[in-house]
């Protein structure tokens, strides 16, 4: 039997906590026997004193075990259970292509996703722009879809890592969100509850990233890889660029449209293609579906070329109560904005810099994201045809096409786009899409 205040005191004084102490505290968070004040105190001591790797693994596992951990053995699946998690960005629609692509190559992807957070778009919000799409199928239906289709993308249920929800809510109001051990445990508790064989992390770097500097993004990626492998889930991480909008679009319906176009081959943004392929390659290799980069890329390109990945996406949409002919007729089903009009720069020049975070917030301001949990989303608004770093813009080439609900909203968005995109006399040097791969 432990006392919560003694565990807090031990950590306050700079000592490492045992696995039993951490489990006692996390179970108390779940059972409401630990007060909010005690959660806040422990969070602050961890913020200042950090945690050792064994402590980080124990915290993550205790949070994972605070609820249901999915077990797939009874389904006798003939492939690995794999997933991807992104720290979030703008125009980051990779999940919608990656899940079907990896499933078409023999993997099983039980993806539990989130809503938009701050300036970043949420996969669930994007999918809900598809009429009828059910992000909360019951457990049996979720398992059926995974077995039959190979991929399902759903929302987090209250049974998965419930201690994390309460812990995070307290961190959010006590300035302890940005602690690497706590971020790591929060991300991985939910992902490891999926019962994975392998995981790839997409950790963003740049003006639209969750972490403010390259060094902090790198530290988070290294922490996640270390903890997940310590929890015996094969995990790698890629540091990918978020100094500009990743896709050509940013919003909800507009990104779903681009995802379908990507899968069918109608249009593939080169940077989005690079990042999506790189993440899929990691999943195939970690899941032992390919022996090396070359074999993985060949398999992935094949399922894009032969239409199998697009077919899997269509089957997933239908299985989750969306239209059965969505891939063929996406334009008919996705909502469109009242006003669609291009915004142009005031002067000619080359796009030299982009405040990606500000562009994400501009989508939120138009109604494409939430300022508070109770807000309803306008799925139709957003940006398409986004200019990229190095593009020459003038009276012919716009900075973006804005999809807005009315003229006022369009004017505000146009102002935000012009302020967020800097021009120069010459094009900047190109930056990589993937900066670094981190493995155990």
From Swiss-Prot:
Pathway: Pyrimidine metabolism; dTMP biosynthesis via salvage pathway; dTMP from thymine: step 1/2. It comes from the Bacteria. GO terms for biological process: pyrimidine nucleobase metabolic process; thymidine metabolic process. PROSITE patterns: THYMID_PHOSPHORYLASE (PS00647). GO terms for molecular function: 1,4-alpha-oligoglucan phosphorylase activity; thymidine phosphorylase activity. InterPro entries: Glycosyl_Trfase_fam3, Glycosyl_Trfase_fam3_N_dom, Glycosyl_Trfase_fam3_N_dom_sf, Nuc_phospho_transferase, PYNP-like_C_sf, PYNP_C, Pyrmidine_PPas_bac/euk, Pyrmidine_PPase_CS. It catalyses: thymidine + phosphate = 2-deoxy-alpha-D-ribose 1-phosphate + thymine. It is an enzyme of class 2 (transferase). Its EC number is 2.4.2.4. The keyword Transferase applies. SMART domains: PYNP_C. Keywords: Glycosyltransferase, Transferase. GO terms for cellular component: cytosol. NCBIfam families: PRK05820.1 (NF004490), T_phosphoryl (TIGR02643), Y_phosphoryl (TIGR02644). Belongs to the thymidine/pyrimidine-nucleoside phosphorylase family. Homodimer. The enzymes which catalyze the reversible phosphorolysis of pyrimidine nucleosides are involved in the degradation of these compounds and in their utilization as carbon and energy sources, or in the rescue of pyrimidine bases for nucleotide synthesis. This is Thymidine phosphorylase. The gene is deoA.
